[in-house]
């Protein structure tokens, strides 16, 4: 590295150290391309982060907003009522949905936490389903069909022919694969197809 570039990098590193010394997160620091290229930094507070805050029915909404203002703009907040979630889990599974509807709860805290984690990591979920098993797979949001097939096995990616797919909602509404085919919602897609959140996929391949 030329001396001039080295001096610039040293100056930026000193600025970063000062930023961190003031109790700031690395995620709120403006990184130059040169600084980002230093893989050895491995700064923990630069990683995607969210805070889970336990609240209850007496929690003042303004307190939550004030807390949100105090943390970095790059850190997200998920609020959950642990006691309420415990009460829901203690109910009979058949009664849980009715209770959640009555309380105006659209999804469980666990679902919201997982969704936020996926959002921050830039992930999406697709499914494979067969006679013995239905399985969820995590993939990067920008992965196409061929790249997603490689998550299951590299041989599938190497011998990729096509992806047969249907949305999760259509799959459920039509009672599975055969019903989806009969209804005309079962599609055939090529290797560049951008897999959508919740797609149910059957990968055709040859090795």
Regions found by a protein language model. Name each.
Residues 1-197, 201, 206-207:
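C-terminal-of-GTPase-core extension/linker across diverse P-loop GTPases
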């Amino acid at each position: 590295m030329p001396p001039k570039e080295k001096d610039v990098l040293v100056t930026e590193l000193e600025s970063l150290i000062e930023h961190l010394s003031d109790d700031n997160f690395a995620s709120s620091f403006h990184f130059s391309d040169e600084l980002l290229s230093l893989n050895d930094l491995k700064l923990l507070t630069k990683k995607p982060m969210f805070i889970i805050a336990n609240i209850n029915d007496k929690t003042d909404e303004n307190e939550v907003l004030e807390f949100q203002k105090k943390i970095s703009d790059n850190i997200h907040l998920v609020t959950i009522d642990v006691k309420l979630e415990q009460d829901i889990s203690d109910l009979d599974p058949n009664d849980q949905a009715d209770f959640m509807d009555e309380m105006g709860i659209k999804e469980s805290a666990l679902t919201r936490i997982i969704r936020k984690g996926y959002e921050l990591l830039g992930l999406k979920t697709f499914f494979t389903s067969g006679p013995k098993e239905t399985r969820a797979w995590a993939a990067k949001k920008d992965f196409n069909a061929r790249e997603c097939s490689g998550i299951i096995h590299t041989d599938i990616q190497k011998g990729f022919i096509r992806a047969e797919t249907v949305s999760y909602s259509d799959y459920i509404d039509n009672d599975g694969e055969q019903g989806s085919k009969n209804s005309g919602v079962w599609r055939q897609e090529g290797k560049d197809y951008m897999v959508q959140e919740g797609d149910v996929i059957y990968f055709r391949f040859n090795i």
